[in-house]
Structure formats: C-alpha cells, structure tokens
C-alpha cells in the first residue's frame, strides 16, 4: 500500500458510514499512508468501534509509526487504550498537557506540540491554536499539493487555514476533517465556505462535526469542491 507518489487516507471512524459494514459513531479517526509513513490522526470515541473498524479495514496497528491527536476531547481520544494494548510505547503527539499523564499511565509516549513541527520531509503538525480547547492540525505537502487534516476546527476552520498559509506561504488545496459547523446558520456556512475558496481551497471533505447543512450547501453550490466521507471510505490523492 505504501506508494511514495500516492497519499491514502482511510476514514476509520466518522459520524456516518460510507460502507455498510463499517460502524458509525460521533467522532473521528483517519488512517494515513504518505511518504513511507503510516499513522493515525485521532482515534474515535471508544475502543470498540475503533478496533472493529480497523479490523474491517484490515489495518494492523503494528504498521503504525505514530498517532496525532488533534485535541483532547473524548470523541478523538477514545481509541488510545486499544492502541496502548497493541502498541505500548507508541509516540502520541498531543496539543497540550491535559491528557499527558493519562497517556503515560496507559503505557504510551506523549509528546506535547508547542509550535509547527516537522515529522518528515512532507508531514507537519501545525502550531496548536486556542479553541477552546487547544487544537492542532496536520499538513501533508509536496511540490504539487498541500492537504490539511482537521479534527474539529474548534479554533475556526478559516483561522486554521490562514495560520497554515502563514506557516507554509501557500494555501492548503484540500481540507479533510471536522469543520464544527453543525450548529450554525446556512448564511454562516456560506460565508465560511466562500472565504475558504477565496483563500485558495479547491476541495473540502466535510466530515465528522461539519454538519449535514454544510455538506448539502457545498454539494449543491460547489459540487466540484465537495468530497464525500463516512467510515470505510478511502481517499487517494
């Protein structure tokens, strides 16, 4: 599966299911293969759904190099105990101190991110931003494209994208993740989507807490920008 030219993102946990054999749950977990690395971005709300969907995806945790936690809410950290059981000592990148002790106690190795952090030549964790809670995102980039993975966008997705532009001197073309727009008006969704497009975003996969209203708005008004989601879906870029 590790093709250096391909970036593969497998949605393990999401609020909806793309494949009938995958369970849905309010939460997020993405399995990523990119540039000789395989890793998890968030771990869903509980060990059970996380474990069963990983099994359905035929993903062996022994192949995982590290885990990035976007923020320390339960619907993104629920699978950590299962990871600890299978991969004790695995590196877990977190955006603040709030779960450091817990992560150490269950036998994993937490690293608190304070600023833009380069994991490899093409993989970066962004500087954590205040939400609340404090949240970090992940960027995968090469000469052609830049992909931003967002957990819940508590700091605001436009703020996250503008910070990425500041850090990398270019806009992410692709956003995959929770936009935290499930409880805002259609007018607000319109403003945010249009701002993202004006910054330079070309494709949005509005999963997890983005809201049905957001998905429908993008799909109806900007079908070329909309990307589908749901547990069991594979995005290849």
Task: Walk through the language-model features, giving the residues of each.
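N-terminal amphipathic/basic leader segments beginning at the initiator methionine
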Residues: 4-12, 118-125
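Conserved beta-strand hairpin/beta-sheet module of binuclear metal-dependent hydrolase folds
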Residues: 7-56, 135-150, 171
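Active-site metal-binding loops of divalent metal-dependent hydrolases
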Residues: 13-16, 43-45, 72, 97-98, ...
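Short active-site oxyanion
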Residues: 37-39, 65-66, 88-91, 145-147, ...
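Active-site metal-binding motif and surrounding structural segment of the metallo-beta-lactamase
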Residues: 48-93, 168-174, 194-197
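Short, structured coil segments at secondary-structure junctions
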Residues: 57, 88, 106, 200, ...
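Cap/insert and terminal regions of metallo-dependent hydrolase folds
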Residues: 73-79, 146, 153-235
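Metallo-beta-lactamase
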Residues: 94-137, 142-143, 227-237
């Amino acid at each position: 599966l590790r093709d250096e030219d391909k970036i593969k993102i497998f949605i393990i946990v999401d609020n909806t299911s793309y494949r009938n054999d995958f369970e849905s749950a309010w939460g997020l977990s993405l399995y990523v293969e990119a540039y000789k690395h395989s890793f998890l971005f968030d771990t869903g709300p509980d060990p059970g759904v996380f474990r069963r969907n990983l099994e359905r995806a035929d993903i062996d945790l022994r192949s995982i190099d590290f885990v990035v936690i976007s923020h320390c809410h339960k619907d993104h950290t629920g699978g950590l105990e299962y990871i600890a059981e299978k991969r004790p000592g695995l590196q877990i990148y977190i955006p603040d101190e709030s779960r450091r002790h817990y992560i150490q106690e269950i036998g994993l190795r937490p690293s608190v991110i304070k600023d833009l952090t380069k994991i490899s030549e093409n993989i970066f964790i962004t500087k954590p931003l205040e939400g609340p809670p404090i949240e970090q995102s992940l960027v995968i980039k090469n000469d052609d494209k830049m992909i931003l993975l967002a957990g819940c966008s508590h700091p605001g997705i436009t703020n996250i994208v503008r910070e990425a532009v500041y850090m990398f001197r270019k806009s992410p073309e692709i956003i995959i993740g929770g936009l935290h727009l499930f409880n805002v008006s259609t007018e607000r969704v319109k403003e945010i989507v249009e701002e993202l497009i004006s910054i330079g975003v070309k494709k949005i996969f509005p999963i997890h807490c983005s809201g049905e209203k957001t998905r429908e708005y993008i799909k109806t008004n900007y079908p070329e920008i909309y990307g589908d989601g749901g547990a069991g879906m594979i995005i290849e870029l």
